[in-house]
Amino acid sequence: MSISLNTCILILKEHHLLKSSAVQDTVATKMDYVSYDSRDIQTNTLFFCKGAGFRPTYLSMAKDNGAICYVAEQPYPEGKGMHALIVRDVSKAMALLSAAFFRFPQDDLYVVAFTGTKGKTTSAYFLKGMLDQANGGKTALISSVNDVVGPKPEDSFKSSLTTPESLDLFRDMRTAVDNGMTHLVMEVSSQAYKKNRVFGLTYDLGFFLNISPDHIGPNEHPNFADYLHCKLQLMVNSRKCIINAETVHFDEIYAAATTTTNPDSIYLFARENFENPNLKVPIDFRFASQELDMKETRFKLYCASDKAKKLPINGDYTLKMLGDFNESNGTAAIIGAGLAGLNHDQCAKGIRDVTIPGRMQTERTKSHGMVVVDYAHNKASMMALMSFMQNEFDNPKIIVVVGAPGDKGVSRRPGFSESLTAYADKAFLTTDDPGFEDPKSIAEEIDSGIDHSKCDVTIELDRKKAIHDAIAMAGPDDVVLICGKGADAFQKIRGVNTPYPSDIVVAQNVINELEGQKEHFRK
């Protein structure tokens, strides 16, 4: 693959991004590689100078290693002798030029995207399971857990960002197309729009699942209004929109969708008993719980409106994943599958056995109650998880192991305090990706907001010991919730991904120590 200097200039001019250019007569004008990392350079590379941490020395390194053109928001002396494209916004420029370099792979994929404060990963996996059932496993995935760009084991790898940098995203999409993938299901975070990682990308289907305050802090969104604004961009950039009618800020979400999408291509869903007298548009799909237990989740989907009845997806569904909150995620995914051309039988078969590493993985122990490992990592997901457990187990003692990440998501900390006060009997506050912050200070900040008359707190920064002590103290009728990291096999500490066995492995080892060796946790 390659891109010419002239093509780059034309694209940047077309989008009113080019401020100036400097063309070197003696330098090649065809770029055969693209990169924003000075350590990843090949001969004739187009190099992007991006990010708050960019230093001019990185451009010098890139030039020495073979870069012949750079894109930046200001000229750099270190780029002397290189082609220079000076732009108004380098993140937008990188998205546009990367798409062109990788030959617009989105044009060869049916692209579906989910946004929401919670439920994105689960919904994405549900939809991938159904599409794979219909297309023979030709569904690519970009999620906060794993990225899948082909059918082979080596085509699946741990993701580093919920939504990758635009260059990586378009490269992965091109790889997926070359590997025979026909569909792409992806999570789109608010940061993806704030940082222009998906700039210029239009989705065949866009889902808005829910919203509540999250990712608000110095290094993320300055306030909730900015967070909501970034989330809304998915609606503006989708050909068909699917919205949870129960979410707060529904009017703003629906209005954003109608700016670019005909109301006939906007679909709403909600629980069977949900009523909103202020809702001015009909709800297209309803779902109702059939049966909840600690083995399966069963619910029924109803096609309510005339346009909904055109999709042959009405009927009963069973999920291997537990939690009544997953009925909403499942409903969204089934609607997406219906819009992609699937029928009820294909959907029911494809969604039934979907599991996700680190999501609602459970183990009923002999003497220490029910142990649950889940990725719940904000107030909304914590409240949903603990509420479900309280109802399912008839008001059990709830013991929670949780921590908050450092350097981001500062707004989550009071949310943890509120949710633990509301539902937990005992909390072990521990370490969870502290970054450059002091994990003890983070734990103390959460602890300061907890009502200790309702929830007893222990601060134990050794996460493995916190998990051990939580399970060891649990009685046979108690519930232990290990929240936040799921299947993550590292802790982010001072800029380093420090190896960590994962909550699942730690919990398995603790149960083995307490009760004897056996295979644990339903997959």
Give residue ranges: language-model regions.
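Acidic, Mg2+-coordinating active-site environments of NTP-dependent enzymes
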Residues: 78-79, 205-371, 447-451, 456
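Short, polar loop motifs at secondary-structure junctions
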Residues: 68-78, 143-146, 246-248, 270-274, ...
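N-terminal leader/targeting and accessory segments in enzymes
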Residues: 1-96, 100, 318, 322, ...
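ATP-dependent carboxylate-amine ligase
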Residues: 1-17, 43-46, 52-54, 338-344, ...
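Short loop/helix-cap segments at secondary-structure boundaries that form the rim of catalytic
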Residues: 41-42, 62, 74-82, 150-152, ...
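Residue-level signal for inorganic ion chemistry
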Residues: 45, 62, 97, 114, ...
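Phosphate-binding loop of NTP-binding sites
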Residues: 92-245, 249-264, 393, 515-521
